[in-house]
Amino acid sequence: MKIQLMLTTLAGITSCFAFGEGFDYSFNLLSDHSVASNSAQDDNQAHRLLFTTEWQWQMDDRWLVAGNLKAFRGDNGEGLTENLQGISNIDAEKFSKIYEMYVQYQFNAETRAKCGQVDANLEFAFVPVAGAFISPPLGITPTAIALPTYYDPALSCSVFYEPEQGFQWMGGVFAGRDHLDFAEQFYVVEGRYVTADTRWSYGFWHHNGDWEVLDQNRIKAISGWYLNYQRQLNDDWALFAVWSSLNDEVDITRQHHMLGVVRQFEPHQLGLMVSEVTQRYSTKDYLAEVYWQHQLQPDLALQPVLQWVNHGEIGLKNQWVWSLRLNWSF
């Protein structure tokens, strides 16, 4: 499952160390341990670790070179539930690799260009206020099946126009074949409207490769759209909503809808969300999550999580999933 991994979730409050002029680096360890009821596996538990090393070199006021390495070890927790939306945004098979490597040029305070190997979901189709949830749909919506994100970013070039408030515009082209080959392309364009307490984002994506529709015919390309909203109600409460669609019948997924709230009271944070995916052949697939995040130290956070999975497939029992996330930066 393609899922999103937001840097705010992975890095938490990151400790950075200077190494020469303009050079910074940081390390992060993210640990998830989950226990599921009614699991089809013999073992109803999964424990996994994601290590991240990030670095950046600010060459001058305009040029930035940055990248990160990631390594995943442990169990792929997707097998605990086998639901459409997943339960952890770090689940994967074992890997170690250069995850991102890019160059960024800042034209002015509002405009920048970014080229290299990039996780698209760190720039497009995300909801900032929802960054602490561990559920995959809080990153990338399940309908954007071609978006190059965790755990396979892609070569790309993107341009961003981002004034502090008002309308923002951005777009990018990504290698659409094996994440390295531009013989096929993935395009995404996004517009935002940002005020002091509100953020709307609306986007359209298109992949021009050959995708097989469910009746075994061939089509040239697929596309979809998304609409994200978040509002800061006051210093403590924020709410968010997501609505997205896959336009072509190359997957059982059709639309994704999500609502959630976040309550911030230092050193704690509380989050609650409900996510729904409509499908072609099955009833709706639901996922709900509530978490309590406690900042034990500036570089160490503990986060108990409870999830409820309502399967869209007939015959599968609903499931409860208890998880404990540890986020340590050093």
Predicted features along the sequence, with ranges:
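Solvent-exposed loop/turn segments connecting transmembrane beta-strands
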Residues: 41-45, 149-151, 176-183, 217-220, ...
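Outer membrane beta-barrel
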Residues: 48-176, 191-193, 255-258, 262, ...
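Transmembrane beta-strand segments of Gram-negative outer membrane beta-barrel proteins
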Residues: 19-38, 65-67, 75, 135-136, ...
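Loop-centered beta-sheet repeat module
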Residues: 160, 166-211
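Transmembrane beta-barrel strands of outer-membrane/channel proteins
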Residues: 27-33, 67-71, 113-117, 171-175, ...
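Outer-envelope beta-barrel architecture signal
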Residues: 19-27, 61-65, 109-111, 155, ...
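Detector for outer-membrane/organellar transmembrane beta-barrel domains
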Residues: 193-280
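Outer-membrane beta-barrel "beta-signal"
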Residues: 318-330
